[in-house]
Amino acid sequence: MGIEEKLPAGVLLTSVEKLVNWSRKSSVWGATFGLACCAIEMMAAGGPHYDMGRWGMEVFRASPRQADLMIVAGRVSQKMAPVLRQIYDQMAEPRWVLSMGVCASSGGMFNNYAIVQGVDHVVPVDMYLPGCPPRPEMLIDAVLKLREKIMHEPLGPNGRKMLEARKARGDVPVVPYGSMPSSYRSDKARRAEWTKAVREGREEQLRIENWMKAQPHLQQYEGLKK
C-alpha cells in the first residue's frame, strides 16, 4: 500500500542507517585469535562442511586492521591478555567481540591466578557463547544473532553515544599495569627490575608478586610470605 505500489519493480525503500548496518552485517571478517580447544571448532565452522562464507565470513584476517570481529576462542592467560587488548585496539571501528566457550567467558575449569576469569575484563564483549567447546553450529548461531544486533545498531548522535558508552566500559582493562612482562617494556624501572629477576631465576615469582599487589582482595595473603 502507498508509495511502494507506484515504484517500478526492483526498487526498495530504506533508510541510510539500515543500509549501512546491512552492509556491515553482511561482511563481518573475523580476526584469527584461536587460543585453545575452541579454535578447532572455529576452524571447522569456516570449513566447507559448515561454510560460514554463506554469511559473508569466508575470510579470517591475520591483520587486525582488516578485521571486524574478534572471536576469542579459548582461555586467556595473564600473559596473553595485553596482546589481546593490543590487537583489539588496532581493530578499526566498528568492531565486535565474540567470547567463544566457557573458558573465555568466565575462566571455566581454569580458576587460578594464571588465567583471566572472563575476557570481558580485558575487552568489551558483544556476544557470549557457552560450551566446552561449543559446536560449529553453535558458533554459527551466535554469529547470526550478532548480525541481528549489528542490523539494529544506531548511527548518528545515538551511535556516538553508544560508542562512548562502549569505550567507557572497555578502555580500562582489569589487567594491572606492570603485572606481566609485556608491560615492562615502556617502564625503565620495571624493566630493570625484571632483568634482575631473570638473572636470579625468579621472574615467575616476581610476576606473581606484582599481580597479587594489584589485586585488593589478595592483600590479606601478603603476610603469609613473612
UniProtKB/Swiss-Prot annotation:
EC number(s) stated in the UniProt entry for this protein: 7.1.1.-
Group of enzyme by EC: translocase
GO biological process, one term: electron transport coupled proton transport
GO cellular component terms, semicolon-separated: plasma membrane; respiratory chain complex I
Membrane topology: Peripheral membrane protein
NCBIfam families named in the record: nuoB_fam, PRK06411.1
Protein name listed in UniProt: NADH-quinone oxidoreductase subunit B 2
